[in-house]
């Protein structure tokens, strides 16, 4: 080394790469039993074959209430619930749908290749997952979902009405199964619906559309009874105060699914009649097997809907088959925690509350 030169040690320079701020969105989160909170959550990341929806309207389902009460071990605290949705495509990872399109869809994400999917009975897919259960749901500003689960919303259908597709399809599927089992046209049947929640109300409206005149709904909430009488133009009664007549109905829909309603259904059904078990509040059974056997009662179960049912329901909603839907209540997403509390306390006449994130 030259005597007049000095060794210069190289310096270690740290290059700081600026970190992009994570995109967040507002969501209604199930935080613990009987508690919902508005919190920031990560914005969905677009994946191949999926879309990111801007949620325009989302309904509170009875199963969301069940989770809210801490009665569904599959839906754990920290989850964004909500599966009755309508929205606009914000980002698309598929050529099937483009940003800006209005859609609703099937919250059941099915495999497409099992025996039930191939039969068109994809509601029974053994490999199914579900929005608002195994992946974040629609109580949020945005949600990701596979594009194959989506159904286009026609221009003459509002997004609030489109958000009723899922529960209305549940009613349609149950009624379709029942009509196959009935021994006479449903228009000629005397019909009893147990429970005047969203499924009971939608079933009553659809049965009226089908021409059923002799229709009665049993509901304990006086506000809901009044709404059902007004919008479905049918008879109602309080089953706590008034007993349903025995052996009187050709068709009974149990939209509650509790021990007491199962017993009521079995007592009310006529020989040769059909009981459709829709609700599942509990599953302990005290069915009168003697009457079931000797009176040739048909007892049916139902689970959600098929893709065909959802598509048919969108068409029915667009044709106003469920009426003007003025009984539906709309609130902002920020009002979601209070909406859950009001539904829990029976303080709203609305059988369906829709939350609006924007």
Give each language-model segment a name.
Residues 10-24:
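Short, Lys/Arg-enriched N-terminal segments with co-localized hydrophobic residues
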Residues 35, 44-58, 71-115, 154-156:
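Glycine-rich beta-strand-centered segment in the early N-terminal region that forms part
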Residues 4:
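Detector for the Zn2+-coordinating histidines of canonical Cys2His2
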Residues 263, 307, 311-358:
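C-terminal hydrophobic helical "lid"/dimerization subdomain
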Residues 181-187, 192, 210, 225-298:
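Glycine-rich cofactor phosphate-binding loops and adjacent beta1-alpha1 units
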Residues 111-194:
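NAD(P)H dinucleotide-binding glycine-rich loop of Rossmann-like/cofactor-binding domains
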Residues 157-241:
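Mid-domain Rossmann-like dinucleotide-binding core that forms the NAD(H)/NADP(H) cofactor-binding site
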Residues 220-221, 281, 305:
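Residues in the short beta-alpha loop(s) of Rossmann-like NAD(P)-binding domains
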